[in-house]
Design a protein with these regions (language model features):
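Helix-loop "lid/cap" segments that line or gate small-molecule binding pockets
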Residues: 34-35, 55-69, 124, 155-156
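Active-site neighborhood of HAD-like aspartate-dependent phosphohydrolases
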Residues: 2-50, 64-69
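Conserved SAM-binding loop
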Residues: 13, 20, 92, 110, ...
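Structural signature of beta-strand start/N-cap positions in the alpha/beta core
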Residues: 10, 101-102, 109, 135, ...
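Hydrophobic alpha-helical segments typical of transmembrane helices
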Residues: 8, 30, 44-47, 55, ...
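Short, acidic loop-to-helix structural element flanking the phosphoryl-transfer center
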Residues: 84-112, 118-122, 149, 153
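Metal-dependent phosphoesterase signature
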Residues: 61-98
Length: 178
């Protein structure tokens, strides 16, 4: 049967990590390993998970508040080392492909707004064969990172969609603050 109900939203924007991509546990372990590599106090799972969705620099500065700000990029390199060694283990949450196909069939614009880097998102999209599924994406190294609303505002402007016709779907308070 065909669904003729009017759409409530034209643009649906997804967070990536922890929303579509089952990556939370790996990100937490990589943050903890990076801190250990530099001899820093290892943040708890809760503290490590809390920063997911922020840009990497902001996230690492938050979990390692005693680290000299000039050394945050070094911590980022250690995080990336651990993450890129294991990212091949990650996958989409069950039902994600079917949900995206159903939304596409209803003619929604689909987008991603993430705290990941452009390289990280592109590699993840390639890994799960979703490279051409989204109409637009924004990453933390291209625009203001969450919780700043700029990436969401840019996506709405790109499609000419008003906020009341836009739905942001995420898994953290950083996503809700957009």
């Amino acid at each position: 049967t065909t669904d003729f109900r009017p759409r409530q939203f034209d643009l649906i924007v997804f967070d990536w990590d922890g929303t579509l991509y089952d990556s939370t546990a790996l990100i937490v372990r990589c943050i903890q390993a990076a801190c250990a590599d530099l001899g820093l106090p290892v943040p708890s799972r809760t503290d490590s998970a809390y920063v997911i969705g922020l840009g990497l620099h902001d996230a690492l500065a938050h979990v390692a508040p005693t680290l000299d700000k000039a050394r945050v990029p070094e911590l980022g390199l250690r995080y990336r080392h651990h993450y890129f060694q294991r990212q091949h283990e990650l996958s989409l949450f069950e039902g994600t492909l079917e949900m995206l196909a159903a939304l596409r069939a209803r003619h929604h614009w689909l987008a991603v707004a993430t705290g990941k880097s452009r390289q990280g998102l592109n590699e993840a999209l390639e890994h799960v064969a979703l490279r051409g599924v989204f109409d637009a994406t924004r990453t933390a190294d291209e625009t203001a990172s969450k919780p700043h609303p700029l990436m969401l505002q840019e996506l709405m402007a790109e499609f000419g969609v008003e906020p009341e016709r836009t739905l942001m779907i995420g898994d953290t308070t950083h996503d809700l603050q957009l």
